[in-house]
Amino acid sequence: DNEPCSASPPTAPARSGCWSRPTGSPWASCAPPCSRSSTDRRADVRPAQPADILACAALCTEIHGFDRSGELKDAIEQKTAVVVEHLDQITGYATLIGFFGHAVARTNQDLMAMIAAAPSFQGPGFLLPTRNYLVFSWCLANGLTLVMQTTLMTIGLYNEPAGAYFPGVLY
């Protein structure tokens, strides 16, 4: 059910929202303009290649404290993984823009570039921490709909990621 939602402040509890495009939405056609931030920072999104795994693993370790290169390798083989580059350096990757994928990015602009470049979202949408107000409000402004609100739960120690991300349900 698509209930109206309000933006959460940056200090909100750990919640994620599942996002999808409304049926017939023109948002998918806005990929080129949406791939630039308000500061016109150029970010290029392309399919991930096996040669990208080490750089992506290092980025994931920088953001999360561990790497998820096994999942990335599988996603590259399935041709669902993408990377975003800025100044010829990988600044983010996604195994899949969808419910079962995850993404890691150095900046919010890198995460938004990958979302904007996605031709579709797999499954019911993708999970996005709604406490990331900048990306949350950008999604709303670009016609995405909050489908459900969820709570991030962990067993044991949890370290807040040091960058932009969206979690996957499989890890």
Language-model features: where?
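Conserved N-terminal entry element of GNAT/NAT acetyltransferase domains
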Residues: 35-50
